[in-house]
Amino acid sequence: MRQFIPMRRVLAVATLGALFWAAPASWAAAPPEAASCIACHGAGGMGNPAAGYPRLAGLPEQYLADQLRYFADGARNNAVMSGMAKPLSAAQVTALATYYSKLKPSGKPAPMPTGAAAAEGERLALRGDWEKGIPACIRCHGPGAVGVGENFPALVGQSAAYIEAQIKAWKDGSRSGDPLGLMHTVALRMTDAQTQAVAQWLAAQPLSPTKSASAKH
């Protein structure tokens, strides 16, 4: 007697199989917990820009581990990630952070904004707005915004939607854990228009800094 298999189950299995089929060769080294990450962050850890899910690939190991802990203890307010992070043991957090930190980021940047928005985004990212006490992004996140150390992650390779959402989260206090409260202080001084402009400009930058971009600060 043939057993009826619900179409929903067939589609779910097919989707999961497709995700694993598309996974990078390094997926063989992935910890089991990473299987829960790919639906939002992708098999290569580059996120889903359209949905606002961030890039994880190549971010600092300690930074990634810290973010999982912040989600678990509420320092970062996100219902989905809180539910994912709370059950993880310290060893599982370390394994996930180590794995994603070693993935090589890839992909194309978003289209460059035009007009006044592009000019304002570039100004804030490379020079800041010192009259309002807003330092340039590259002062902490490095030339090309590719990240510096464990506390200042790469901004390039992230979507405009994600960057904008995080600045707003720093501003309203739903995200914390920043060294010395730096991002909270900076975000409070930024207008919504500035937040959107710098997010769009950063999302349009290449994963590797160009000489011209690095030399403008």
Swiss-Prot record:
Binding site for heme c 1: 37, 40-41
Pfam families on file: Cytochrom_C, Cytochrome_CBB3
GO CC entries: periplasmic space
Top-level taxonomic group: Bacteria
Record's keyword terms, sorted: Heme, Iron, Metal-binding, Repeat, Signal
An example molecular function term from Gene Ontology annotations: iron ion binding
Binding site for heme c 2: 137, 140-141
Domain Cytochrome c: 29-104, 116-206
Record note on modification: Binds 2 heme c groups covalently per subunit.
Signal peptide start-end: 1-28
InterPro entries recorded: Cyt_c-like_dom (IPR009056), Cyt_c-like_dom_sf (IPR036909), Cytochrome_c4-like (IPR024167), Cytochrome_c_Oxidase_Subunit (IPR050597)
Function recorded in the entry: Acts as an electron acceptor for the thiosulfate dehydrogenase TsdA.
Descriptive protein name: Thiosulfate dehydrogenase electron acceptor
Species of the source: Thiomonas intermedia (strain K12) (Thiobacillus intermedius)
Lineage start: Bacteria, Pseudomonadati, Pseudomonadota, Betaproteobacteria, Burkholderiales
